[in-house]
């Protein structure tokens, strides 16, 4: 991953041209990051992005163990379920494009967060009551699928709040996303007494904070 990141950096520096006119460019400085962090609207939406990402990583980090070791799925069936949820993210992205023609991003974001929170709560209830498969799989799908709408719209709204510092805003959001994802992944195995409950608790917790 470090090698890929280094290659991406080199391509960005030496291959991809800057498209913004020189007169509109903002010099890179730590002051730009400070200004971005001081903007409350940006911070609010950046936290939505971060905790939405954390919810997804709670699912990613635990799903293999929960479905194969606890629920007894074969590797092939687990791959099918995991792939279906990944397809759900693609469907959510396509749906978001259509919805933006009719509704404001903030309204779509609100509904997506509610769906994600309700579905994550059902995942937790299933984990606490013995993992009935069909409700669990359906709830998991609808806990993951809205993340495309959440991440896309929250990112757009966050950057819109600091248009002149869009690059710094993207950097701050990227840092926050992976910081929260890195923190939530070990928590899955530390709370609730089992990875299934831990996954549900972390998904619900992240979703609730994102809604707030």
Residue ranges, per PLM feature:
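A late C-terminal transmembrane helix in Major Facilitator Superfamily
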Residues: 157-197, 202-203
């Amino acid at each position: 991953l470090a090698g890929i990141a280094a290659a991406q950096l080199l391509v960005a520096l030496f291959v991809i041209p800057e498209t913004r006119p020189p007169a509109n460019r903002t010099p890179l400085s730590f002051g730009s990051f400070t200004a971005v962090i001081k903007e409350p609207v940006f911070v609010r939406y950046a936290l939505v992005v971060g905790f939405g990402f954390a919810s997804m990583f709670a699912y990613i980090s635990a799903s293999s163990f929960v479905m194969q070791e606890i629920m007894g799925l074969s590797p092939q069936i687990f791959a099918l379920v995991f792939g279906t949820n990944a397809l759900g993210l693609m469907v959510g992205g396509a749906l978001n494009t259509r919805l933006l023609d009719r509704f404001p991003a903030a309204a779509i974001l609100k509904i997506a967060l509610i769906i994600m929170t309700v579905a994550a709560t059902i995942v937790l209830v299933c984990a606490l009551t013995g993992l009935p498969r069909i409700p669990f799989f359906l709830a998991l799908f609808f806990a993951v699928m809205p993340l495309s709408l959440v991440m896309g719209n929250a990112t757009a709204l966050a950057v819109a709040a600091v248009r002149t510092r869009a690059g710094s805003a993207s950097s701050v959001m990227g840092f926050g996303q992976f910081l929260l994802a890195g923190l939530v992944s070990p928590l899955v195995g530390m709370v609730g007494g089992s990875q299934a409950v831990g996954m549900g608790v972390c998904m619900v917790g992240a979703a609730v904070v994102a809604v707030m």
